[in-house]
């Protein structure tokens, strides 16, 4: 955990060099200033694994493909992880500028998940120093091999509730905190706590008009199996028009909140990391204004 906190510190240090002179959060001539909203804290609605403070615009559909290979530390026998992969596909839709819903399916435990994400308020130049969002989700696994007998719907279900508070400090640097509560009706193994609280964080440092460094991390509190550890992901965003391409390294196999919060096994700083990518493509489904 100390090494991860050091990474966040380094991201913050990158911000200090330009924080005093960057004009992005200053009033523009002729603007009201107080009500001017600040946008673009992150390139996508996800930092890497975690929800970000970004929202879909009304009428936009986000088609997402997430791919995570095996551990690089497995070596040449598994072609450094390329022979093993985990996959998630999802569709997110902006009902309004402040309300997004989504559904996805993962190969890890054959899980199906759905979520609702609402923006409570958005950062402005003068009156609101940060954005605040609330996300809640449902996850169900369909892999019956995890139980000695056919489990019921309730036995296969999990839920999460997350608060996301983030700030765009200047045109290059953004950071967020995202505490989350995950409840799994039947955890695996059964000795794990059903309710796990985790404190998460995410950061972005913009390198150029189209590229940025990103990082997200969660520290779970409670009883989990000894082989489970904190999920950490470090990546590079490449934005190209309607696409966002995220290349990253992560120790997490699962790509929904239940999976990566409660069942991450790789120890990142011991070489147990996976290479992966996220692809986001935005489609305009309906007109913003009628």
How should these model regions be labeled?
Residues 1-23:
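Bacterial Sec-dependent N-terminal signal peptides
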Residues 20-147, 157-161, 166-185, 205, ...:
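Transmembrane beta-barrel domains of Gram-negative outer membranes and organellar outer membranes
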Residues 153-154:
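C-terminal low-complexity, charged extensions that often adopt amphipathic alpha-helices
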Residues 173-219:
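A mid-sequence, solvent-exposed acidic-amphipathic segment
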């Amino acid at each position: 955990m100390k090494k991860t906190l050091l990474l966040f510190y380094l991201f913050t240090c990158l911000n200090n060099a330009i924080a005093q002179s960057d004009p992005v959060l200053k009033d523009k001539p002729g603007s009201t200033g107080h009500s001017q909203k600040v946008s673009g804290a992150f390139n996508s609605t996800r930092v890497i694994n975690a929800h970000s403070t970004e929202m879909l615009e009304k009428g936009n559909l986000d088609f997402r493909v997430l791919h995570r290979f095996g551990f690089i530390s497995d070596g040449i026998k598994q072609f450094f992880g390329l022979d093993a992969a985990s996959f998630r596909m999802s569709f997110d839709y902006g009902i309004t500028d402040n309300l997004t819903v989504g559904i996805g399916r993962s190969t890890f435990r054959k899980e199906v998940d759905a979520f609702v994400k609402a923006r409570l308020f958005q950062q402005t130049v003068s009156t609101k120093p940060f954005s605040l969002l609330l996300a809640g989700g449902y996850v169900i696994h369909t892999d019956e091999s995890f139980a000695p007998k056919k489990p019921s719907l309730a036995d296969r279900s999990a839920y999460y509730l997350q608060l996301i508070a983030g700030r765009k400090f200047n045109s290059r640097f953004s950071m967020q905190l995202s505490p989350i509560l995950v409840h799994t009706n039947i955890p695996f193994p059964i000795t794990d706590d059903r309710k796990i609280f985790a404190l998460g964080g995410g950061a972005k440092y913009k390198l150029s008009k189209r590229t940025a460094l990103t990082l997200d991390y969660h520290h779970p509190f409670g009883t989990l199996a000894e082989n489970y550890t904190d999920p950490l992901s470090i990546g590079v965003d490449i934005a190209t028009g309607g696409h966002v391409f995220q290349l990253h390294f992560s120790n997490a196999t699962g790509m929904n909140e239940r999976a990566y919060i409660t069942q991450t096994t790789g120890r990142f700083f011991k070489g147990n990391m996976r290479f992966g990518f996220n692809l986001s493509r935005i489609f305009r489904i309906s007109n913003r204004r009628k």
